[in-house]
């Protein structure tokens, strides 16, 4: 019984393996149209080892099914190894270029430099902000503010310059004087001409009061203006300039 049962069980085991191999072969044939059954040693040279070098199909019980070709792994002991040097404990003469360049950049880059200290505050006197170089003069019998004459130059004039200057003074004295303080209109509006036009609103007609405010020595030929000097000139262009006038009503 046992001898008869053993061949039957062996046939059952082989049939199961055959069915499994055929099932694997059919599944592989569905994915590979060039599937061919294994016909023995002509296709599978190492049929006994389960390898098929021709089509990379594993032969199992007479059928070739597609699997990856078996390659035994190399033991770890046989792999080539490279010795890793131990970290040196003593300092070496080598430096890391990236670190040194970074430190150099952070040290000398203008972006990372501290800002320059601010300048010390400069204090000034309020009186220096106001220019007080004007004086009251009686010009052609009118009281007006005029700018003071600049300090005379230290150099002496040559005889030619002196004669030319005297001729200019005599010419100015013979020239008829223009009343620059007269109003262009007959209006009696009072006030100070702050706009800076070439004429003023009105001036004081009282020459006696003007004579008290000014002296004869203050009056000079330079105080009289030529007719072509009616337009207002800036201080940089003229030494003498009418800034504003004072009007008094008696």
UniProtKB/Swiss-Prot annotation:
Annotated Acidic residues bias: 202-229
Give the UniProt keywords, A-Z.
Neurogenesis
Residue ranges of the region described as Disordered: 201-250
> Which Pfam families does UniProt cross-reference here?
UPF0524
The record's gene field reads C3orf70
User: To which protein family does this belong?
Assistant: Belongs to the UPF0524 family.
| Superkingdom | Eukaryota
Record the organism: Homo sapiens
Keyword Glycoprotein part of the UniProt annotation: no
Name of the molecule in the record: UPF0524 protein C3orf70
Please describe what this protein does. Answer: May play a role in neuronal and neurobehavioral development.
For this entry, list what GO says about its biological process: circadian behavior; nervous system development
